Amino acid sequence: MAAAGSSSRFAVTCGLLSQYMRERQQPQPPVTVLEAVAEEEEEEDARTMQLFPPRAAAADGVATPSAGTAPLTIFYDGRMVVVDDVPVEKAAELMRLAGSACSPPQPAHAAALPEMPIARKASLQRFLQKRKHRITTTSEPYKKAAVASPAPEKSFAVAPVKDEPATWLGL
């Protein structure tokens, strides 16, 4: 569970690898991994005596990948890095490292998802309150429905009716 501001170990490792590759290849033209390995072997051979001539002959020829190595392709941050002749052990170690890394950071909109049901509930409550208010206010369709329904009759004991003057006739 990585914090929001930190990045996963895999991202850090890939960042360090890309920084190392940039520093190493900056002053030189692009060199393939096969050429770099051949140069290292030549430097090693120059320091030591060549006691085994077949090895010297193999170093001059094209290097063939051994049975325990294979090319490795890494896709990261929109870039592709291809490394030739990676030992199986190193590839397995990289896979374990990538698998043990934390999940990638979630986008910002994913954090807002738990808040959505609460926001919907509040919106629904406001809507229902407004609807209830509209129903109880004096609007014509609802008044007619309320007037049209007959009121239940009261008991037969009726209070005396007072004759009120018809003030409406004086209009």
UniProtKB/Swiss-Prot annotation:
Expression triggers: By jasmonate, wounding, and cold, drought and salt stresses. Down-regulated by abscisic acid (ABA).
GO biological process: regulation of defense response; regulation of jasmonic acid mediated signaling pathway; response to wounding
Protein name in UniProt: Protein TIFY 11d
Cellular compartments per GO CC: nucleus
Cellular compartments annotated: Nucleus
Keywords annotated in UniProt: Jasmonic acid signaling pathway, Nucleus, Stress response, Transcription, Transcription regulation, Ubl conjugation
Organism this protein belongs to: Oryza sativa subsp. japonica
Domain Tify: 65-100
Pfam families assigned: Jas_motif, tify
